Each structure stands twice: as structure tokens, then as C-alpha cells.
């Protein structure tokens, strides 16, 4: 590999504030904010809006979508209004 062209790969904490959940991993992401982790070291922290701790699929709190109603609404909106002509 060529030196000096790759971003720095280092430990980073990702934090999901909505679920009060954080995890330490390695990444090239950068951040001005830092956090002291449970091991006593200070790491850059990246705030995320959603993670496995707050995503509806993983938490089991899914929101069901009325797919049948949406299909009927689509068909009503784009239904042809008259006999179809073949070209």
C-alpha cells in the first residue's frame, strides 16, 4: 500500500443518544468531541441518530404500514380513464 494516502484508522465511540447506547469500534470517522470510555481512555465520539438499540426492526416495536390501502390509492390515482388503445 502507498503511504500517506489512506485515512487514519483508529478507535471511535459511536453513541445513540435516543437509546442511551454507545459502542467502541474502529473507524476512519473523525470528530471534535471526545468521551472517556469504560477502560479509562479518551476516544472521539460520533453521535448517530439511529442504531440497533433504537431501530424499530431490532427493538420489536415495528410500525405496520397499510400496504393494501397504499396500493389501492396508487391504482385509483393512475388508473386509465377510458378504453385502452393498443399501439
Swiss-Prot record:
Q: Subunit structure, briefly?
A: Part of the 50S ribosomal subunit.
- Superkingdom, natural source: Bacteria
Biological-process GO terms, alphabetical: translation
Query: According to its record, what are the GO cellular component terms?
Result: ribonucleoprotein complex; ribosome
Supply the PANTHER family for this chain: 50S RIBOSOMAL PROTEIN L31, CHLOROPLASTIC, LARGE RIBOSOMAL SUBUNIT PROTEIN BL31C
Detail the disulphide connectivity of this chain as listed in its UniProt entry. none
Annotated coiled-coil positions are none
The record, for Pfam families, names:
Ribosomal_L31
Which keywords has UniProt assigned to this entry? Ribonucleoprotein, Ribosomal protein
Protein name listed in UniProt: Large ribosomal subunit protein bL31B
Alphabetical list of Gene3D superfamilies matching this protein? Ribosomal protein L31
Assigned protein family: Belongs to the bacterial ribosomal protein bL31 family. Type B subfamily.
Query: What GO molecular function terms would the record report?
Result: structural constituent of ribosome
Amino acid at each position: 500500500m502507498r503511504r500517506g494516502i489512506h485515512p487514519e484508522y483508529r478507535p471511535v465511540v459511536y453513541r445513540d443518544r435516543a437509546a442511551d447506547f454507545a459502542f467502541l469500534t474502529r473507524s476512519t470517522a473523525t470528530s471534535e468531541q471526545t468521551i472517556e470510555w469504560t477502560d479509562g481512555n479518551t476516544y472521539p465520539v460520533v453521535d448517530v441518530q439511529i442504531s440497533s438499540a433504537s431501530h424499530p426492526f431490532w427493538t420489536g416495536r415495528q410500525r405496520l404500514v397499510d400496504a393494501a390501502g397504499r396500493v389501492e390509492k396508487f391504482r385509483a390515482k393512475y388508473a386509465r380513464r377510458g378504453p385502452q388503445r393498443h399501439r
